[in-house]
Amino acid sequence: MNKKNVRISALFVLISTCAFAQEKENVASEQVLEEVVVSDSKFALAKEKSGKVITKITNEELNNRPGQSVAAILNTVAGVEINGNQSAAGKNLGYYIRGGKNSQVLILIDGIPVNDASGISIEYDLRLLPAEQVESIEIMKGAASTLYGTGAATGVINIKLKKSDKKSVSGNGYFSVGTNATAIHQNQKASDFNQGFSVSGRTTKTTYFAALNSTEIKGISQIAPPNSNVSYEDDPFSRLNYLAKIGYKVTNKLTLDFFGNYDQIKNDYDGGFDNTGTSDTNLNKTSSKQFRFGFSPKFKYDKGEFVLNSS
């Protein structure tokens, strides 16, 4: 009788131990798959714990859409409309979330609000930003005035730029050529050129990232009617972008991050349509430049961290 009791007890111990090991494995896998967002609370938060409707475009999804602009990628998100993204290169863009106008949508770059003071509604020009410099995009749909002010009445678009790689030194380069054909004019000549490169890495105390990107597009005329004998000029578009980031670890608790960014676009635009082409001249030009720099110290303490973003 005693021997049977001992054997049964040993069997139960083995079963309970195996079940416990399986439980730990499931918990570990759930932590790895957790998707984190920051637009909702300005702090890293699990997406399923967010009280807002947030769509995140990951770096993997961006890499699967080569050649597309930031505006074209955003236009694929339900509830987001980027007016003008399917038009000729250089076309001015309007962005709308749930029917709200440009001034009711806030654009963030690395968590910092950006705008264009030269415009009437001072909204940020998405044409300035190349998709090759973007790490991920978060779109929060719905009012967020309590966090970001009245400029976020219908939504927030938080664009996170790329940063240093985990390797000591790494680099990346690309070059692409495309045509600029339309449904009417099947132009097969090379007229769309995109090129760029980046280098990043880290040492014991320093991280760095630098990127140079450029785009040159011959362009087309949007007002040229089909089968017309009137000559209309093409409207070229060019963009040049520099981005540099550097971080320094002062102590185990204090880190200093610096960044500098220069964006420039130039493009021609069409004059009024009069069926003669006389108003569509090469004098119709516009250009836009933006220079941003910032400093972001981060201090860690026992129960959290203090971060200051300035730009």
Protein language model features and the residues they cover:
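Residues that define the transmembrane beta-barrel architecture of outer-membrane proteins
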Residues: 151-153, 189-195, 202, 236-240, ...
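Transmembrane beta-barrel strands of outer-membrane/channel proteins
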Residues: 171-179, 210-216, 258-264, 308-310
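Short acidic/polar hinge/loop motifs at secondary-structure boundaries
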Residues: 113-141
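Extracytoplasmic beta-strand/coil segments of soluble accessory domains associated
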Residues: 71, 75-113, 135-136
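Outer-envelope beta-barrel architecture signal
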Residues: 103-105, 167-173, 204-208, 240, ...
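Flexible loop and strand-edge segments within Gram-negative outer membrane beta-barrel domains
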Residues: 23, 217-223, 229-243, 247-249, ...
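N-terminal periplasmic accessory domains that precede
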Residues: 35, 70-73, 93-96, 108, ...
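N-terminal periplasmic "start-of-domain" segments of outer-membrane beta-barrel proteins
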Residues: 35-65, 94
